[in-house]
């Protein structure tokens, strides 16, 4: 294609503004929590239900931006169009008139994205360059990143980190070494080939000398670009300029995070973290709008704990107790299908996650899953040696921490059809109120099922 293809100037806002304004009016009427710019983030280990929350509130937003991470974790969304496991696509893709953006902080896996686009459009969802845009400054996750991820996990053996082997850590390592290719380079094939040749010489040294693996050829890489990179070219543009215009026109922007605070590279349980920043504070940088002010941070918390991967997990259940909760909550990884590690809600970790995210509002998800329990367990403190603490400890100490568990009465009834706070059983309300007090943040949303409408506004 011609140099600069996909970089057409913005000539007008492509949204159905009247429809959006009508949606906002409805939100105001029902007492929604709609602010100009909002981030929806995970408070714990990920898998909290961020996708279902983004899908719920996007009717009140103009733009949804994914600002970090890659295809290594999934967001499950259930709506009138079906059930979807999204890995790279922003969860606003199902809403008419919403522009979805993959920001510069994303690990752009063209291969996974193209397969995901095919899967979602096959279920009747329209995806065009009008409602999906890819930052020209997003870096490409290349085939060798996935190879290196698997090779390193194999080398580590029983000391592995539990990677999803999607190439995320090698990708971000290369990005910080300035050894990646930007998506915008797909618009300039001649320069792209030259850049890939330079990277190839360097990367093949690692593959062959460190891991004794097969090297790549430039022909293999160009074939990969032709098969996958070419397909996403129409979506690539200067999304920073688009977002600045949106901000100037007072459009509402929703920032969608991947994973949770406890997986954040700087604030999580290092080294059992992801390789990017999952905190809301990174949203302006990773989205391509560093001047953005975030008015609200909706932190998503599951009504119990779940975790995929290795590392300390203080409240973990095992055996039959764990399997019952896992089956009740369908706790299997959206990307890997791996059984998630599960246990009761961890107030210590959740309070820390709320603080890291500077959450202003909490969405508590999957409350309905706990309906089978006679007593609801809650980890209220940790025992470290001879002392107890309610402060989240330094990562190196976490492996020694033991949970101090207290119990509240269960409600033992199906609450999946409840839609108002007053109709929840008293025991369920007390459980929510207890969590709210202990973590120090208002719980404004309570979900009682995976469907879009299975939500209680407080």
Tell what function each PLM region has.
Residues 10, 18-34:
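Short, Lys/Arg-enriched N-terminal segments with co-localized hydrophobic residues
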Residues 31, 35-458:
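Non-transmembrane, aqueous-exposed alpha-helical and coiled segments at domain scale
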């Amino acid at each position: 294609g011609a140099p600069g293809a996909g970089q057409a100037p913005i000539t007008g806002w492509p949204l159905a503004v009247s429809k959006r304004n009508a949606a906002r009016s409805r939100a105001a009427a029902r007492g929604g929590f709609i602010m100009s710019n909002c981030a929806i983030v995970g408070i714990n280990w990920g898998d909290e239900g961020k996708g279902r929350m983004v899908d719920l509130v996007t009717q009140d937003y103009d733009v949804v931006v994914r600002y970090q991470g890659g295809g290594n974790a999934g967001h499950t969304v259930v709506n009138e169009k079906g059930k979807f496991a999204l890995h790279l696509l922003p969860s606003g893709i199902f809403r008419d008139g919403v522009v979805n953006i993959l920001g510069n902080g994303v690990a752009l896996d063209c291969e996974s994205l193209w397969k995901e686009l095919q899967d979602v459009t096959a279920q009747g969802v329209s995806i065009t360059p009008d409602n999906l845009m890819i930052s020209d400054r997003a870096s490409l996750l290349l085939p060798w990143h996935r190879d290196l991820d698997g090779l390193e996990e194999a080398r580590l053996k029983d000391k592995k980190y539990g990677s999803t082997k999607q190439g995320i850590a090698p990708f971000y390592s290369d990005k910080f070494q300035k050894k990646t290719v930007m998506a915008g380079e797909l618009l300039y094939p001649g320069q792209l080939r030259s850049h890939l040749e330079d990277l190839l010489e360097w990367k093949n040294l690692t593959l062959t000398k460190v891991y004794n693996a097969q090297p790549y050829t430039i022909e293999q890489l160009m074939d990969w670009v032709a098969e996958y990179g070419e397909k996403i070219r129409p979506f690539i543009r200067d999304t920073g300029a688009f977002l600045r215009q949106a901000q100037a026109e007072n459009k509402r922007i929703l920032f969608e995070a991947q994973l949770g605070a406890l997986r954040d590279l700087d604030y999580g349980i290092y080294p059992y973290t992801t390789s990017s920043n999952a905190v809301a504070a990174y949203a302006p940088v990773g989205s391509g709008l560093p001047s953005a002010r975030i008015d609200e941070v909706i932190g998503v918390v599951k009504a119990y704990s779940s975790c995929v991967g290795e590392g300390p997990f203080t409240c973990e259940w095992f055996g039959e107790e764990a399997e019952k909760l896992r089956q009740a909550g369908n706790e299997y990884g959206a990307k890997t299908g791996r059984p998630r590690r599960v246990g009761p809600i961890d107030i210590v970790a959740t309070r820390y996650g709320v603080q890291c995210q500077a959450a202003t509002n909490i969405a508590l998800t999957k409350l309905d899953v706990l309906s089978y329990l006679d007593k609801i367990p809650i980890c209220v403190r940790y025992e470290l040696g001879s002392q107890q603490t309610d402060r989240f400890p330094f990562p190196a100490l976490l492996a020694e921490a033991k949970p101090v568990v207290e119990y509240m009465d269960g409600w033992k009834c199906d609450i999946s059809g409840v839609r108002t706070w007053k109709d929840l059983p008293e025991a369920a309300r007390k459980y929510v109120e207890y969590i709210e007090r202990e973590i120090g943040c208002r719980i404004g949303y309570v979900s009682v099922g995976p469907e879009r409408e299975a939500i209680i506004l407080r």
